[in-house]
């Protein structure tokens, strides 16, 4: 509890409040209160969170992979940029729709949050299970809708909606590691700082996904999500390079979360700009 005292000046017309703020440790973000406040695994609230993850992952994979299928079957009308925009918009919309319950939709994000003590470890298996189920159901739906049955693994006929390297395995691994780490860093930043309002979280995360798909899509497929790669692999039986899309995004997301945890919080960081937006240093004084 803060210590508040009241005193008057000699003239009796000024009141001074002396407030002793709580220690910084009490207000630092992120907190670890999830250990005591997380719902029981069989509670209605936890089941609602799992349903949100299932539905959200389903629509995420359905929309993003449908854009890929339409682009392949209709003379590349969607284009790479269009596909990237679809992925970004669908994740943005889902964050706004389901974020009040749960909006991971990605096993790498779930594991990264757990590794940084921002998510209960005992809920991880259930989350990953429903995320993979949602991705698999979406992939099965797309297979029926677009009749993608003809030798998709070889890419000689129908397009494979899963993830596969365009170049070497090493190139794809490094790319997935980097872009997923960047995505996770953004997720942690916008969800723990007071500078970002809740109204902007979905927009910023969606924009990050769009950016990653634009420059990494032709290299690794820009999966950033093990569930996004597992679902199509299970439905079509194509597992070439699947280890890349299980390991690289997970390690990348964990590294992104740990990097954010090592950085100073907004309360402790030395301000680079003043409240008016002007720099404390002249441009010529900044290191190049």
Swiss-Prot record:
It is found in: Endoplasmic reticulum membrane. It is a multi-pass membrane protein. A motif (NPA 2) lies at residues 225-227. Keywords: Acetylation, Endoplasmic reticulum, Membrane, Phosphoprotein, Repeat, Transmembrane, Transmembrane helix, Transport. Specifically expressed in roots with high expression in root elongation zone and root stele. It holds the Pfam family MIP. InterPro entries: Aquaporin-like, Aquaporin_transptr, MIP, MIP_CS. The chain crosses the membrane at residues 50-70, 77-97, 126-146, 170-190, 202-222, 234-254. The keyword Acetylation applies. The modification Phosphoserine is found at residue 278. One of its GO terms (cellular component) is endoplasmic reticulum. GO terms for molecular function: channel activity; lactate transmembrane transporter activity. The modification N-acetylmethionine is found at residue 1. Aquaporins contain two tandem repeats each containing three membrane-spanning domains and a pore-forming loop with the signature motif Asn-Pro-Ala (NPA). PANTHER family: AQUAPORIN NIP2-1, AQUAPORIN NIP2-1-RELATED. Low water transport activity in yeast cells. Belongs to the MIP/aquaporin (TC 1.A.8) family. NIP (TC 1.A.8.12) subfamily. This is Aquaporin NIP2-1. The gene is NIP2-1.
């Amino acid at each position: 509890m803060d210590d508040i005292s009241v005193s008057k000046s000699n003239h009796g017309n000024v009141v001074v409040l002396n407030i002793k703020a709580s220690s910084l440790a009490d207000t630092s973000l992120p907190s670890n209160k999830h250990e005591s406040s997380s719902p029981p695994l069989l509670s209605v609230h936890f089941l609602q969170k799992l349903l949100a993850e299932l539905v959200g992952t389903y629509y995420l994979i359905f929309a993003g992979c449908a854009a890929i299928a339409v682009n392949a079957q209709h003379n590349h009308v969607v284009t790479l940029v269009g596909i990237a925009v679809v992925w970004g918009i669908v994740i943005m919309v889902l964050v706004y729709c389901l974020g009040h319950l749960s909006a991971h939709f990605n096993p790498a994000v779930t594991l990264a949050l757990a590794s940084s003590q921002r998510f209960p470890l005992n809920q991880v298996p259930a989350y990953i299970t429903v995320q993979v189920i949602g991705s698999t159901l979406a992939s099965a739906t797309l297979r029926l809708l677009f009749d993608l049955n003809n030798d998709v693994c070889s890419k000689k006929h129908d397009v494979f909606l899963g993830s596969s390297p365009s170049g070497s395995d090493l190139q794809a691994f490094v790319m997935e590691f980097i872009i997923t780490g960047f995505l996770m860093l953004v997720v942690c930043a916008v969800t723990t700082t007071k500078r970002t309002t809740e109204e902007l979280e979905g927009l910023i995360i969606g924009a990050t996904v769009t950016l990653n798909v634009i420059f990494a899509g032709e290299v690794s497929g820009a999966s950033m999500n093990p569930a996004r790669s597992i679902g199509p692999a299970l439905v079509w039986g194509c597992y070439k390079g699947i280890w890349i899309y299980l390991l690289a995004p997970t390690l990348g997301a964990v590294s992104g979360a740990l990097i954010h945890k090592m950085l100073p919080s907004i309360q402790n960081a030395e301000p680079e700009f003043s409240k008016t937006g002007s720099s404390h240093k002249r441009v010529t004084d900044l290191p190049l």
